[in-house]
Design a protein with these regions (language model features):
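Start-transfer (signal-anchor) and selected internal transmembrane alpha helices
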Residues: 1-28, 115, 203, 217-232
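Extracytoplasmic loop-helix module adjacent to an early transmembrane segment
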Residues: 18, 22-62, 72-77
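Short hydrophobic/aromatic helix or loop-helix immediately within or flanking a transmembrane segment
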Residues: 58-92
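Transmembrane-helix motifs of polytopic, lipid-linked glycan transferases
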Residues: 91-111, 353-360
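Hydrophobic, aromatic-rich transmembrane alpha-helices
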Residues: 99-100, 329-367
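Short hydrophobic alpha-helices at membrane interfaces in multi-pass membrane enzymes
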Residues: 112-119, 153-178
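Membrane-interface alpha helices of multi-pass inner-membrane proteins
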Residues: 168-187, 196, 228-238
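Membrane-proximal stem/loop segments at transmembrane-domain junctions that anchor or position
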Residues: 244-330
Length: 421
Protein backbone atom coordinates (compact mmCIF):
# COMPACT_ATOMS: atom_id res chain seq x y z
CA UNK A 1 0.00 0.00 0.00
CA UNK A 2 2.82 2.39 0.86
CA UNK A 3 4.45 1.57 -2.48
CA UNK A 4 1.25 2.49 -4.32
CA UNK A 5 1.02 5.81 -2.44
CA UNK A 6 4.65 6.52 -3.29
CA UNK A 7 4.03 5.86 -6.99
CA UNK A 8 0.86 7.97 -7.04
CA UNK A 9 2.55 10.91 -5.35
CA UNK A 10 5.56 10.80 -7.68
CA UNK A 11 5.84 12.83 -10.89
CA UNK A 12 5.39 9.70 -13.00
CA UNK A 13 2.35 8.81 -10.93
CA UNK A 14 0.68 12.11 -11.81
CA UNK A 15 1.22 11.46 -15.52
CA UNK A 16 -0.05 7.90 -15.09
CA UNK A 17 -3.22 9.06 -13.37
CA UNK A 18 -3.90 11.90 -15.80
CA UNK A 19 -3.39 9.86 -18.97
CA UNK A 20 -4.14 6.38 -17.59
CA UNK A 21 -7.54 7.05 -16.02
CA UNK A 22 -8.61 8.98 -19.11
CA UNK A 23 -7.44 6.14 -21.37
CA UNK A 24 -9.29 3.58 -19.24
CA UNK A 25 -12.49 5.60 -19.42
CA UNK A 26 -12.13 6.06 -23.19
CA UNK A 27 -11.45 2.34 -23.69
CA UNK A 28 -14.56 1.33 -21.75
CA UNK A 29 -16.78 3.76 -23.65
CA UNK A 30 -15.37 2.89 -27.09
CA UNK A 31 -15.76 -0.83 -26.42
CA UNK A 32 -19.30 -0.63 -25.07
CA UNK A 33 -20.95 2.26 -26.94
CA UNK A 34 -21.60 3.13 -30.57
CA UNK A 35 -19.65 6.23 -31.55
CA UNK A 36 -21.32 8.40 -34.18
CA UNK A 37 -21.31 11.93 -35.56
CA UNK A 38 -23.80 14.31 -33.98
CA UNK A 39 -24.59 16.12 -37.26
CA UNK A 40 -24.28 15.65 -41.00
CA UNK A 41 -21.58 18.33 -41.15
CA UNK A 42 -18.92 15.97 -39.82
CA UNK A 43 -20.12 13.19 -42.11
CA UNK A 44 -19.66 15.47 -45.11
CA UNK A 45 -16.15 16.42 -43.97
CA UNK A 46 -15.27 12.76 -43.56
CA UNK A 47 -16.68 11.84 -47.00
CA UNK A 48 -14.64 14.61 -48.64
CA UNK A 49 -11.37 13.85 -46.85
CA UNK A 50 -11.71 10.10 -47.34
CA UNK A 51 -12.61 10.53 -51.01
CA UNK A 52 -15.87 8.59 -50.71
CA UNK A 53 -17.67 11.03 -53.01
CA UNK A 54 -15.04 11.66 -55.70
CA UNK A 55 -12.55 8.80 -55.31
CA UNK A 56 -9.78 11.01 -53.95
CA UNK A 57 -9.21 13.18 -50.88
CA UNK A 58 -10.68 16.66 -51.15
CA UNK A 59 -9.21 18.94 -48.41
CA UNK A 60 -10.96 22.00 -49.88
CA UNK A 61 -14.17 20.93 -48.11
CA UNK A 62 -16.01 24.03 -46.87
CA UNK A 63 -16.32 23.08 -43.19
CA UNK A 64 -12.66 22.31 -42.45
CA UNK A 65 -9.44 24.29 -42.65
CA UNK A 66 -7.35 23.32 -45.68
CA UNK A 67 -4.17 22.80 -43.65
CA UNK A 68 -5.97 20.41 -41.31
CA UNK A 69 -7.69 18.59 -44.15
CA UNK A 70 -4.48 17.89 -46.11
CA UNK A 71 -2.72 15.63 -43.53
CA UNK A 72 -5.95 13.77 -42.75
CA UNK A 73 -6.50 13.25 -46.49
CA UNK A 74 -2.93 11.91 -46.85
CA UNK A 75 -3.57 9.41 -44.05
CA UNK A 76 -6.71 8.22 -45.84
CA UNK A 77 -4.62 7.66 -48.97
CA UNK A 78 -2.01 5.65 -47.07
CA UNK A 79 -4.42 3.56 -45.00
CA UNK A 80 -7.95 4.02 -46.38
CA UNK A 81 -9.39 1.29 -44.15
CA UNK A 82 -8.95 3.39 -40.99
CA UNK A 83 -11.41 6.15 -39.99
CA UNK A 84 -8.78 8.88 -39.71
CA UNK A 85 -11.17 11.78 -39.26
CA UNK A 86 -12.82 10.02 -36.31
CA UNK A 87 -9.39 9.11 -34.94
CA UNK A 88 -8.38 12.76 -35.11
CA UNK A 89 -11.38 13.78 -33.01
CA UNK A 90 -10.88 11.04 -30.42
CA UNK A 91 -7.13 11.64 -30.11
CA UNK A 92 -7.58 15.43 -29.90
CA UNK A 93 -10.15 15.07 -27.13
CA UNK A 94 -8.13 12.44 -25.26
CA UNK A 95 -4.89 14.43 -25.33
CA UNK A 96 -6.59 17.71 -24.41
CA UNK A 97 -8.47 16.19 -21.49
CA UNK A 98 -5.38 14.37 -20.21
CA UNK A 99 -3.38 17.60 -20.28
CA UNK A 100 -6.12 19.37 -18.31
CA UNK A 101 -6.10 16.64 -15.68
CA UNK A 102 -2.31 16.76 -15.52
CA UNK A 103 -2.67 20.45 -14.62
CA UNK A 104 -5.04 19.44 -11.82
CA UNK A 105 -2.44 17.07 -10.37
CA UNK A 106 0.28 19.70 -10.74
CA UNK A 107 -1.78 22.23 -8.80
CA UNK A 108 -2.60 19.68 -6.10
CA UNK A 109 1.09 18.88 -5.69
CA UNK A 110 2.05 22.56 -5.54
CA UNK A 111 -0.62 23.22 -2.91
CA UNK A 112 0.26 20.04 -1.00
CA UNK A 113 -3.37 18.97 -0.81
CA UNK A 114 -4.72 15.42 -0.88
CA UNK A 115 -4.47 13.53 -4.16
CA UNK A 116 -8.18 12.80 -3.72
CA UNK A 117 -9.10 16.32 -4.90
CA UNK A 118 -7.70 16.06 -8.46
CA UNK A 119 -8.82 12.42 -8.76
CA UNK A 120 -12.41 13.39 -7.91
CA UNK A 121 -12.21 16.37 -10.28
CA UNK A 122 -10.98 14.09 -13.08
CA UNK A 123 -13.67 11.45 -12.55
CA UNK A 124 -16.47 14.05 -12.30
CA UNK A 125 -15.27 15.80 -15.46
CA UNK A 126 -14.97 12.56 -17.42
CA UNK A 127 -18.37 11.20 -16.40
CA UNK A 128 -20.49 14.33 -16.56
CA UNK A 129 -18.77 16.59 -19.11
CA UNK A 130 -16.66 14.60 -21.58
CA UNK A 131 -18.63 11.40 -22.20
CA UNK A 132 -21.32 12.98 -24.39
CA UNK A 133 -18.78 14.49 -26.85
CA UNK A 134 -17.04 11.10 -27.10
CA UNK A 135 -20.09 9.05 -28.12
CA UNK A 136 -21.60 11.85 -30.21
CA UNK A 137 -18.67 13.46 -32.04
CA UNK A 138 -19.08 17.00 -33.32
CA UNK A 139 -16.34 19.28 -34.60
CA UNK A 140 -17.70 22.25 -32.64
CA UNK A 141 -17.23 20.37 -29.36
CA UNK A 142 -13.84 18.91 -30.32
CA UNK A 143 -12.65 22.43 -31.09
CA UNK A 144 -14.00 23.55 -27.72
CA UNK A 145 -12.14 20.81 -25.81
CA UNK A 146 -8.89 21.63 -27.61
CA UNK A 147 -9.25 25.30 -26.74
CA UNK A 148 -10.35 24.59 -23.17
CA UNK A 149 -7.13 22.69 -22.53
CA UNK A 150 -5.24 25.91 -23.36
CA UNK A 151 -7.51 27.84 -20.97
CA UNK A 152 -6.75 25.41 -18.13
CA UNK A 153 -3.01 25.26 -18.87
CA UNK A 154 -2.73 29.06 -18.87
CA UNK A 155 -4.83 29.39 -15.71
CA UNK A 156 -2.71 26.80 -13.88
CA UNK A 157 0.64 28.44 -14.69
CA UNK A 158 2.44 29.78 -11.61
CA UNK A 159 4.86 32.67 -11.48
CA UNK A 160 7.31 30.40 -9.64
CA UNK A 161 7.37 27.84 -12.48
CA UNK A 162 10.67 27.19 -14.22
CA UNK A 163 11.41 29.06 -17.44
CA UNK A 164 11.34 25.79 -19.42
CA UNK A 165 7.91 24.98 -17.96
CA UNK A 166 6.55 28.37 -19.01
CA UNK A 167 7.93 27.93 -22.53
CA UNK A 168 6.16 24.56 -22.78
CA UNK A 169 2.94 26.16 -21.52
CA UNK A 170 3.03 28.93 -24.13
CA UNK A 171 3.91 26.44 -26.89
CA UNK A 172 1.08 24.09 -25.92
CA UNK A 173 -1.46 26.92 -25.70
CA UNK A 174 -0.44 28.17 -29.14
CA UNK A 175 -0.77 24.74 -30.78
CA UNK A 176 -4.02 23.84 -29.00
CA UNK A 177 -5.72 27.13 -29.85
CA UNK A 178 -4.49 27.02 -33.45
CA UNK A 179 -5.90 23.50 -33.86
CA UNK A 180 -9.11 24.62 -32.17
CA UNK A 181 -9.41 27.47 -34.68
CA UNK A 182 -8.69 25.16 -37.62
CA UNK A 183 -11.22 22.58 -36.42
CA UNK A 184 -14.11 24.99 -35.88
CA UNK A 185 -13.70 28.75 -36.08
CA UNK A 186 -17.01 29.73 -34.47
CA UNK A 187 -16.38 27.85 -31.21
CA UNK A 188 -12.88 29.37 -31.07
CA UNK A 189 -14.39 32.82 -30.52
CA UNK A 190 -16.12 31.76 -27.30
CA UNK A 191 -13.00 29.89 -26.18
CA UNK A 192 -10.92 33.03 -26.61
CA UNK A 193 -13.20 34.85 -24.16
CA UNK A 194 -12.27 32.33 -21.46
CA UNK A 195 -8.63 32.27 -22.54
CA UNK A 196 -8.55 36.05 -22.21
CA UNK A 197 -9.91 35.64 -18.68
CA UNK A 198 -7.08 33.19 -17.90
CA UNK A 199 -4.53 35.69 -19.22
CA UNK A 200 -6.03 38.57 -17.22
CA UNK A 201 -6.04 36.31 -14.15
CA UNK A 202 -2.33 35.64 -14.62
CA UNK A 203 -1.56 39.34 -14.97
CA UNK A 204 -3.74 40.32 -12.00
CA UNK A 205 -2.20 37.76 -9.62
CA UNK A 206 1.23 38.96 -10.69
CA UNK A 207 0.47 42.53 -9.60
CA UNK A 208 -1.69 41.75 -6.56
CA UNK A 209 -0.07 38.75 -4.91
CA UNK A 210 3.60 38.62 -5.95
CA UNK A 211 5.33 41.28 -3.85
CA UNK A 212 8.73 39.65 -4.39
CA UNK A 213 8.62 40.48 -8.11
CA UNK A 214 10.02 43.83 -9.21
CA UNK A 215 7.87 46.24 -11.18
CA UNK A 216 10.03 45.58 -14.24
CA UNK A 217 9.42 41.82 -14.04
CA UNK A 218 5.68 42.38 -13.65
CA UNK A 219 5.61 44.62 -16.71
CA UNK A 220 7.67 42.07 -18.64
CA UNK A 221 5.26 39.28 -17.65
CA UNK A 222 2.32 41.37 -18.86
CA UNK A 223 4.10 42.17 -22.12
CA UNK A 224 4.84 38.48 -22.75
CA UNK A 225 1.20 37.48 -22.34
CA UNK A 226 -0.11 40.34 -24.49
CA UNK A 227 2.46 39.63 -27.21
CA UNK A 228 1.56 35.95 -27.14
CA UNK A 229 -2.17 36.65 -27.57
CA UNK A 230 -1.55 39.08 -30.44
CA UNK A 231 0.79 36.62 -32.20
CA UNK A 232 -1.77 33.84 -31.72
CA UNK A 233 -4.65 35.84 -33.21
CA UNK A 234 -2.54 36.97 -36.18
CA UNK A 235 -1.39 33.39 -36.81
CA UNK A 236 -4.91 31.96 -36.66
CA UNK A 237 -6.40 34.48 -39.05
CA UNK A 238 -3.35 34.26 -41.29
CA UNK A 239 -3.81 30.50 -41.62
CA UNK A 240 -7.53 31.03 -42.27
CA UNK A 241 -6.85 33.63 -44.98
CA UNK A 242 -4.42 31.35 -46.83
CA UNK A 243 -6.78 28.38 -46.41
CA UNK A 244 -9.71 30.29 -47.91
CA UNK A 245 -7.50 31.61 -50.73
CA UNK A 246 -6.51 28.06 -51.71
CA UNK A 247 -10.02 26.63 -51.32
CA UNK A 248 -11.67 29.41 -53.32
CA UNK A 249 -9.60 28.47 -56.37
CA UNK A 250 -11.75 25.35 -56.65
CA UNK A 251 -14.87 25.59 -58.83
CA UNK A 252 -16.64 23.20 -56.47
CA UNK A 253 -15.94 25.50 -53.53
CA UNK A 254 -17.12 28.54 -55.48
CA UNK A 255 -20.35 26.75 -56.35
CA UNK A 256 -20.83 25.76 -52.71
CA UNK A 257 -20.26 29.34 -51.55
CA UNK A 258 -22.96 30.54 -53.93
CA UNK A 259 -25.37 27.94 -52.57
CA UNK A 260 -24.34 28.67 -48.98
CA UNK A 261 -25.21 32.34 -49.43
CA UNK A 262 -28.80 31.25 -50.07
CA UNK A 263 -28.77 28.83 -47.15
CA UNK A 264 -27.45 31.37 -44.64
CA UNK A 265 -29.78 34.09 -45.91
CA UNK A 266 -32.98 32.06 -46.08
CA UNK A 267 -32.73 28.62 -44.46
CA UNK A 268 -30.43 29.01 -41.48
CA UNK A 269 -31.43 28.86 -37.80
CA UNK A 270 -34.71 30.60 -36.97
CA UNK A 271 -35.36 31.90 -40.49
CA UNK A 272 -38.18 29.60 -41.52
CA UNK A 273 -41.07 27.83 -39.76
CA UNK A 274 -41.61 24.05 -39.70
CA UNK A 275 -43.87 22.64 -42.41
CA UNK A 276 -46.39 21.33 -39.92
CA UNK A 277 -48.76 24.10 -38.96
CA UNK A 278 -47.62 26.35 -41.83
CA UNK A 279 -48.89 24.34 -44.80
CA UNK A 280 -50.65 27.33 -46.38
CA UNK A 281 -47.45 29.37 -46.46
CA UNK A 282 -45.50 26.59 -48.17
CA UNK A 283 -48.29 25.64 -50.55
CA UNK A 284 -48.39 29.27 -51.71
CA UNK A 285 -44.92 28.79 -53.24
CA UNK A 286 -45.70 25.26 -54.56
CA UNK A 287 -43.84 23.45 -51.80
CA UNK A 288 -45.07 20.21 -50.28
CA UNK A 289 -43.60 18.38 -47.28
CA UNK A 290 -41.11 16.52 -49.50
CA UNK A 291 -39.78 19.80 -50.90
CA UNK A 292 -39.41 21.21 -47.41
CA UNK A 293 -37.58 18.10 -46.18
CA UNK A 294 -35.27 18.25 -49.19
CA UNK A 295 -34.05 21.69 -48.08
CA UNK A 296 -33.34 20.31 -44.60
CA UNK A 297 -31.06 17.76 -46.27
CA UNK A 298 -29.40 20.55 -48.27
CA UNK A 299 -30.93 19.32 -51.54
CA UNK A 300 -31.81 22.34 -53.68
CA UNK A 301 -32.45 20.77 -57.09
CA UNK A 302 -36.24 21.30 -57.21
CA UNK A 303 -37.14 24.22 -59.50
CA UNK A 304 -39.60 25.48 -56.86
CA UNK A 305 -36.70 26.05 -54.48
CA UNK A 306 -35.53 29.41 -55.74
CA UNK A 307 -34.72 32.88 -54.47
CA UNK A 308 -38.32 34.06 -54.86
CA UNK A 309 -39.89 31.22 -52.86
CA UNK A 310 -37.20 31.34 -50.18
CA UNK A 311 -37.66 35.09 -49.79
CA UNK A 312 -41.45 34.71 -49.51
CA UNK A 313 -41.15 32.09 -46.76
CA UNK A 314 -38.49 33.99 -44.83
CA UNK A 315 -40.24 37.37 -44.94
CA UNK A 316 -43.59 35.88 -43.91
CA UNK A 317 -41.98 34.10 -40.97
CA UNK A 318 -39.91 37.11 -39.88
CA UNK A 319 -43.02 39.30 -39.85
CA UNK A 320 -44.72 37.02 -37.31
CA UNK A 321 -41.74 36.43 -35.06
CA UNK A 322 -41.87 37.31 -31.39
CA UNK A 323 -39.82 40.00 -29.66
CA UNK A 324 -36.09 39.50 -29.13
CA UNK A 325 -36.55 38.91 -25.39
CA UNK A 326 -39.37 36.43 -25.92
CA UNK A 327 -37.34 34.58 -28.56
CA UNK A 328 -34.28 34.40 -26.30
CA UNK A 329 -36.27 33.07 -23.34
CA UNK A 330 -38.04 30.52 -25.54
CA UNK A 331 -34.80 29.17 -27.00
CA UNK A 332 -33.16 28.81 -23.58
CA UNK A 333 -36.29 27.21 -22.10
CA UNK A 334 -36.39 24.66 -24.91
CA UNK A 335 -32.74 23.79 -24.28
CA UNK A 336 -33.43 23.29 -20.56
CA UNK A 337 -36.51 21.14 -21.12
CA UNK A 338 -35.04 19.02 -23.91
CA UNK A 339 -31.84 17.97 -22.11
CA UNK A 340 -31.59 16.96 -18.44
CA UNK A 341 -27.81 17.20 -18.98
CA UNK A 342 -28.21 20.97 -19.28
CA UNK A 343 -30.12 21.21 -16.00
CA UNK A 344 -27.56 19.17 -14.05
CA UNK A 345 -24.59 21.02 -15.55
CA UNK A 346 -26.05 24.44 -14.70
CA UNK A 347 -26.65 23.25 -11.15
CA UNK A 348 -23.06 22.01 -10.90
CA UNK A 349 -21.67 25.39 -12.04
CA UNK A 350 -23.81 27.15 -9.43
CA UNK A 351 -22.59 24.80 -6.69
CA UNK A 352 -18.95 25.28 -7.69
CA UNK A 353 -19.47 29.05 -7.62
CA UNK A 354 -20.92 28.88 -4.09
CA UNK A 355 -18.29 26.47 -2.77
CA UNK A 356 -15.44 28.50 -4.25
CA UNK A 357 -16.50 31.82 -2.84
CA UNK A 358 -18.01 30.83 0.51
CA UNK A 359 -15.99 27.79 1.58
CA UNK A 360 -12.63 27.72 -0.22
CA UNK A 361 -11.69 31.35 -0.79
CA UNK A 362 -9.50 33.00 1.83
CA UNK A 363 -11.06 36.09 3.41
CA UNK A 364 -8.21 38.42 2.50
CA UNK A 365 -8.58 37.43 -1.17
CA UNK A 366 -12.29 36.72 -1.28
CA UNK A 367 -13.13 39.86 -3.25
CA UNK A 368 -10.71 38.82 -5.99
CA UNK A 369 -12.05 35.26 -6.09
CA UNK A 370 -15.62 36.51 -6.30
CA UNK A 371 -14.70 38.90 -9.11
CA UNK A 372 -12.98 36.15 -11.13
CA UNK A 373 -15.92 33.77 -10.57
CA UNK A 374 -18.43 36.42 -11.62
CA UNK A 375 -16.43 37.15 -14.77
CA UNK A 376 -16.36 33.44 -15.66
CA UNK A 377 -19.99 32.58 -14.86
CA UNK A 378 -21.22 35.99 -16.01
CA UNK A 379 -19.41 35.58 -19.31
CA UNK A 380 -20.99 32.14 -19.66
CA UNK A 381 -24.45 33.63 -19.04
CA UNK A 382 -23.94 36.52 -21.48
CA UNK A 383 -22.76 34.19 -24.26
CA UNK A 384 -25.68 31.85 -23.53
CA UNK A 385 -28.15 34.73 -23.84
CA UNK A 386 -26.48 35.86 -27.06
CA UNK A 387 -26.82 32.41 -28.64
CA UNK A 388 -30.42 32.24 -27.45
CA UNK A 389 -31.09 35.63 -29.05
CA UNK A 390 -29.47 34.53 -32.33
CA UNK A 391 -31.45 31.28 -32.30
CA UNK A 392 -28.23 29.24 -32.38
CA UNK A 393 -28.60 27.15 -29.27
CA UNK A 394 -28.43 23.43 -30.03
CA UNK A 395 -26.74 21.21 -27.44
CA UNK A 396 -23.32 21.52 -29.11
CA UNK A 397 -23.41 25.32 -28.82
CA UNK A 398 -24.27 25.02 -25.15
CA UNK A 399 -21.36 22.60 -24.67
CA UNK A 400 -18.99 25.10 -26.30
CA UNK A 401 -19.80 27.44 -23.38
CA UNK A 402 -20.21 24.90 -20.59
CA UNK A 403 -16.91 23.05 -21.02
CA UNK A 404 -14.53 26.05 -20.72
CA UNK A 405 -16.58 27.59 -17.89
CA UNK A 406 -16.74 24.35 -15.89
CA UNK A 407 -13.06 23.47 -16.36
CA UNK A 408 -11.91 27.01 -15.55
CA UNK A 409 -13.91 26.95 -12.32
CA UNK A 410 -12.46 23.53 -11.43
CA UNK A 411 -8.97 24.92 -12.01
CA UNK A 412 -9.73 27.87 -9.76
CA UNK A 413 -11.01 25.48 -7.09
CA UNK A 414 -7.61 23.74 -6.99
CA UNK A 415 -5.71 27.05 -7.11
CA UNK A 416 -7.67 28.58 -4.26
CA UNK A 417 -7.33 25.64 -1.87
CA UNK A 418 -4.22 27.36 -0.52
CA UNK A 419 -3.18 30.98 0.05
CA UNK A 420 -0.02 30.56 -2.00
CA UNK A 421 -0.07 31.82 -5.60
Amino acid sequence: MEKIKEIINSRKGKWLLAFGLTFLCYAIVLLTADVSYATNDDSRIMYALAGYASGEAYPQQAFINYFLGVPIGVLYKLLPSLPWYTIYHIFAMYLSESVMFLCFYKLAKDKKVSIAFPICAQIISLLFIFMVPLVSIQFTVTSTILGTSAVVVMASMKHSDKRSTKICIYAYCFIALLLSFMTRTLSWYSIMCFFALSCVYQIATCYLYCPDLTKKKKHLHTLKICTFVIALVISCFGVRFVSLYIKNKSEITQAYNTYNDYRVKYMDYGQHPPYKGHEKLYNAVQWDNSTYRATLCLLYMDENINASSLKTITEAYQANKHSALSKTVTNIRELLYDYSFVQYSLLSIFLIFVILNLMVAKKEKQWFHILVSICCCGGFAVLLLYLGFKGRLPLRSYQSLLIPCFMFMMTMFLRWLDVSY
